[in-house]
């Protein structure tokens, strides 16, 4: 499973909000930059939406 697929899997398997910190904790071998890139891609594809801002930013699946 690629790093991108692992990040997407964490987001899809999390109920409610997920933060970058949650993803980095579950995938410690993946860089912050990679997580940000995949989250942006998922936002652009309309799979997730951003909630909050700054340090309180979280992401929620669009079901």
Residue ranges and their predicted role:
Residues 1-63:
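C-terminal regulatory or interaction extensions
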């Amino acid at each position: 499973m690629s790093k991108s697929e692992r990040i997407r899997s964490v987001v899809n398997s999390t109920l409610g909000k997920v933060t970058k910190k949650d993803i980095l904790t579950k995938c410690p071998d993946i860089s912050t930059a990679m997580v940000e890139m995949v989250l942006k891609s998922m936002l652009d594809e309309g799979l997730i939406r951003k909630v909050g801002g700054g340090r309180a930013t979280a992401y929620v699946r669009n079901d």
